[in-house]
UniProtKB/Swiss-Prot annotation:
It is found in: Cytoplasm, Nucleoid. Keywords: Calcium, Cell cycle, Cell division, Chromosome partition, Cytoplasm, DNA condensation. Involved in chromosome condensation, segregation and cell cycle progression. May participate in facilitating chromosome segregation by condensation DNA from both sides of a centrally located replisome during cell division. Not required for mini-F plasmid partitioning. Probably acts via its interaction with MukB and MukE. Overexpression results in anucleate cells. It has a calcium binding activity. It comes from Haemophilus influenzae (strain PittEE). Pfam families: KicB, MukF_C, MukF_M. InterPro entries: Chromosome_partition_MukF, MukF_C, MukF_C_sf, MukF_M, MukF_M_sp, MukF_WHTH, WH-like_DNA-bd_sf, WH_DNA-bd_sf. This is Chromosome partition protein MukF. CDD domains: MukF_C (cd16337). Residues 212-240 are annotated as: Leucine-zipper. Interacts, and probably forms a ternary complex, with MukE and MukB via its C-terminal region. The complex formation is stimulated by calcium or magnesium. It is required for an interaction between MukE and MukB. The keyword Cell division applies. GO terms for molecular function: calcium ion binding. One of its GO terms (biological process) is chromosome condensation. The keyword Membrane does not apply.
Amino acid sequence: MIETSQTIPELVSWAKDREFSLNLPTERLVFLLAIAIYNNERLDGEMLEADLVDIFRHTMNAFEQSTDAIATRANNAINELVKQRLLNRFSSEFTEGLAIYRLTPLGVGVSDYYIRQREFSALRLSVQLSIVADEIQRASDSAEEGVENNESEHYWRRNVFAPLKYSVAEIFDSIDLSQRIMDENQQSIKDEIAELLTKDWQAAISSCERLLDETSGNLRELQDTLNAAGDKLQAQLLRIQDCVIGRDDLYFIDQLITDLQSKLDRIISWGQQAIDLWIGYDRHVHKFIRTAIDMDKNRVFSQRLRNSIHNYFEHPWFLWTAQAERLVDLRDEEMVLREDDALGELPEELQYESLSDLHDQIVEHMQDLLIAYRENNRPIDLSLVLKEQLENYPLSRHFDVARIIVDQAVRLGMANDDLSGIYPDWQVINKRGAEVQAHVIDKY
């Protein structure tokens, strides 16, 4: 795909010839992580064998292992890390038999995964996307300048290809790696929830709710950050791609742009898919809890309640109860189709009104309202228009009314602030706390 890429047979042959292998039991992995942490605290990044022996002694204490022949065992562990290319050993006649050790790129990569890649926050993602946006912006400006001045291939490699490949692509890879770590984190939370459900039910349900809500919130926050920047990044990549269309000598840039577009699409797509999968898991856990309680009405739970009542004066407790409002319970698993024939006439206020009729009425009204703005060249403050119009409709229709108003408004014009990258403030549009985030439409 890119110039430096290798085929699968080439990579297989390369790894086979060098006899690459990794074998890191828990003790060896902990030893490597301890070396990495110690190495980060040193300015020169160099370690003596005595340093490594001391580190090994500390790790063995954590495993409560014997310290007999510690020097020999430490030397064996060091030799294993050197053999697996996790450590580099340097020695010469000037060191008088004292070797110097440095972590290899592989050692740094393995330890970095366990130490520094565990945190994936919206703030970190925002910073990464901000850096990417700046780099792509500079590259697109350079690309347009290169077209105007008919610059040489050297100019394109230095000002367009290099920042995209060595900055933007690496940050995309970092975000992709962080998403994979989030996948692993979700799996660990699932294991924790499964363990909780085998313990005390009152504490388990509360803890499960907290874990489910925290994970859902984190996934949604991160995906919102990605969605906000994704379209703008794709637009900048398309600017660069337009500049190299028809230029056979710049094929390497076109290939790189295609690669970056695919990576960005994959990141955003998987983020949304992860949210959908987690929502499904969330529903599954809640359904499991409800089913377990329903099936256990006359067994374990009732017996626990009897024992608690019997021992109330020795161990007082609070009784928490919950009753679902059945008439407004719209969960999919509790909806039942009814085929009973309805007889008689409904009161006028309960007469059925089709959604298409409602849609046509609202569209006609909103068109008349919004066209007046365009004819007078008045800006449309969507939040204000929504707030005023929703007051005329019952709460059950607010979603459809809001969707129709927004759909009609964006057909009339656009907001200049959309192009500036400024995020609009959230504005409350009804008494139930619904909010909308929209720029003022000021260009028709």
